[in-house]
Curated annotation (Swiss-Prot):
Entry GO terms, CC: cytosolic large ribosomal subunit
Coiled-coil positions: none
Family designation: Belongs to the bacterial ribosomal protein bL17 family.
Protein name, as recorded: Large ribosomal subunit protein bL17
Organism the protein comes from: Methylorubrum populi (strain ATCC BAA-705 / NCIMB 13946 / BJ001) (Methylobacterium populi)
GO biological process terms, semicolon-separated: translation
Domain of life: Bacteria
Gene Ontology terms for molecular function: structural constituent of ribosome
HAMAP family recorded: Ribosomal_bL17
Length: 138
């Protein structure tokens, strides 16, 4: 019986799961909408909601806690300067999950996880050219 087991393992080690959710959290904060499998989206939502609740109180301690979770300085900055003030008056429920059909290769259920009141222009926005691309252009 699997009574009182919280979360899913996703056939990954604990370190791999932690890194996966850190990367997915950073991607969601960056693009404000990502497409992933439904179980991953369901497990990602509480992680991101707690981060946004941290972002509502801008303090050094909260920034360090967020940095330990996300591990991306630019996304922590966006969390505290853009997302925190945006959801200051909302008591919770910062993300929504919408089902998006099934993946072609393995028929896995897919979902779109996005922020409520999201910035539509942030979707698909890249961080800019990399050092390799600028070296190739020169």
């Amino acid at each position: 019986m699997r009574h009182s087991y919280r979360g899913r393992r996703f056939n990954r080690t604990a370190e791999h799961r932690k890194a996966m959710f850190a990367n997915m959290s950073a991607a969601l904060i960056k693009h404000e909408q990502i497409v992933t499998t439904l179980p991953k989206a369901k497990d990602l939502r509480p992680v991101v909601e707690k981060l946004i609740s941290l972002g509502r109180t801008d303090s050094i301690h909260a920034r360090r806690l967020a940095m330990a979770q996300i591990r991306d300085a630019d996304m922590v900055k966006k969390l505290f300067t853009v997302l925190g003030p945006r959801y200051q008056s909302r008591p919770g429920g910062y993300c929504r999950i919408m089902k998006a059909g099934f993946r072609y290769g393995d028929n896995a259920p897919m979902a779109v996880i996005e922020f409520v009141d999201r910035d539509v222009d942030a979707r698909g926005k890249d961080s800019g050219p990399t050092a390799v691309e600028t070296a190739d252009a020169a």
